[in-house]
Amino acid sequence: MISKYGTIGILGGMGPEATANAYHEIIDSTPVTKDQEHIPVIIYSNPQIPDRTDGILYGGESPLPELLVTTKKLEYSGADFVIIPCNTSHFFIKELRASVNIPVISMIEETLAFVKEKYPYITKVGLLATTGTIKTGIYNNIFSSANMDILSPECGEQESLVMESIYGE
C-alpha cells in the first residue's frame, strides 16, 4: 500500500532526541490498525551538523553545508518532502528549499497556520526556544506577517532558565 501522504524525510540529529520525538509524534498521530498502514519515513540523523546558535550568532562553523548535504540525501533517498525538528535550523530554510526539488516544510509556518486556525483572535504568542531561535527573529518574521507579536523571556531568564532546560547545563 502506498501512503497517501508520501514518504516523509526527517532532517535530524539536532539533537537526536528531537529527531526521535518527531518520529514518535508521527507514529502516535497516525490512525492505523496494522503496521502496514503507517506512513513511510526516512530519517537522516546527522550528528555532524555544527551547532546552529554558535554558527549563526557567534561566528562558529556554519551548519548550512551539512544541512544542505543532509536535505539532498533525503531527497535522493526517496523522501517526498522534508521536515526539520529543529527551530533554529529554520534560519536556513530558504537555502534548503532552493537546494532540492521537494518541499521543505517549515514548522514555523505550520505553527502560524495552526494558531490562526485555532485561535484567530490571538495577537500575542509566547515562545520558549534556544537563544539562537529567539535572536534570529525567525518566529517574529513569520508571525509579524499575521500581525502577531512574539513574547519571549528577558535575556537573563532566557540564559539561566530556558537554555539550561534545553541543554541541561
Residue ranges and their predicted role:
Residues 1-169:
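Non-catalytic structural scaffold of enzyme domains
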